[in-house]
Amino acid sequence: MKTLLSSPSFDDLIRLLRAWRFWLLVALLGGLLGAAVYFIAPPDFRVRATVVVTFNMEKAWPVNSDKELFYYLERESRKVWEVAWADATLQQVADETGFSVLELRSGKLELTQPQDGGWHFYATDPQAAVAAKLASAWAGAFSAQIHQGIETAVALDAARKALAVNPQDAKLQASISELEAKSLGITPELQISLAQAKDLPAERKSSLGMYVLAGAALLLAIGALLILFFLHKENVP
C-alpha cells in the first residue's frame, strides 16, 4: 500500500499481524506515556452532592393514565431543573464560593437527575476542597430555593381557595398577585431532602486507567500507520 487513499491489501494485514512484538512494545510505551501525562497534568477533581426529589405524583396528579403521569413528571422535572440553574440559585453559590455565575455555568457545575429520586450535583476544580465546597453550596442553594418555592406554592393554593369563597376580597387578590410573582411554578406536593452535602469524597474527573488506555490506543494507531505507509517489509519485526 503506497498511498493513504488506497485500500489495504492482504499482504498489508499480514504485515500488521507479524509485528506482534512491535504492538506489545508500542502498547506498553503508550500506557506509560498516558500515565506520565496523568501525573504531570492531572485532571480536575470531581465531587458529587445529592438531593432526593420526590414528586408524589399520585397526590399531585391523581389519574390512571401512565402516559399522562409520564408527561406530568417530565414537565415538573424540567421546572425543578431550571431552578437548579436559575440566577438566584447560582448567585447564592457564587456568594459562598467566590466564583462568578458565568464561571459556574461554564463547566464548573454539572447536574444529572433521574426525575423522581436522587439528583446529583457535580462540581469540578483542580483543588478537591474547592470542588467539595462548590458541590455542597450548589446542592444547599438548590434545596433552599425549592423549599421557598414549595412554601409559596402552598400559600398560593390556599389563597386561591379562599378567593373562590370570597371573590371580592381585594386583599386576597393582592396577595395572590404577589405570590404569583414569586412563584417557581412547582407543585406544592413536591418534597426534597438534602441527602449528601457534607464530607464529600473527591475523585479525579478521569481515571488513570482511561489515560493509560488512551495513550496505548494513540501509539497503536500511529504504529499501524508507520507499518502500513512508511516501513518496508524487511524493517518489520
Question: What are these language model-derived features?
Answer:
Residues M1-A27, L184, S193-A195, A224-P237:
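Short, disordered/basic amphipathic segments at the extreme N-terminus
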Residues F45, V52, N64-S65, E74-W81, ...:
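Soluble oligomerization/assembly scaffold segments of membrane-associated complexes
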Residues F22-Y38:
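Hydrophobic membrane-insertion alpha-helices, especially the h-region
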Residues K2-L13, S65-Y72, P201:
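Juxtamembrane loop-helix boundary motifs flanking transmembrane segments in multi-pass membrane proteins
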Residues I40-M57, H232-P237:
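Flexible, low-complexity linker/tail segments at the boundary of structured domains
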Residues L33-G34, L218, I222-G223:
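Alpha-helical transmembrane segments of multipass membrane proteins
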Residues R15-W20, P201-L208:
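Short, Lys/Arg-rich cytosolic juxtamembrane segment immediately N-terminal
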Residues R204-L218:
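N-terminal membrane-entry
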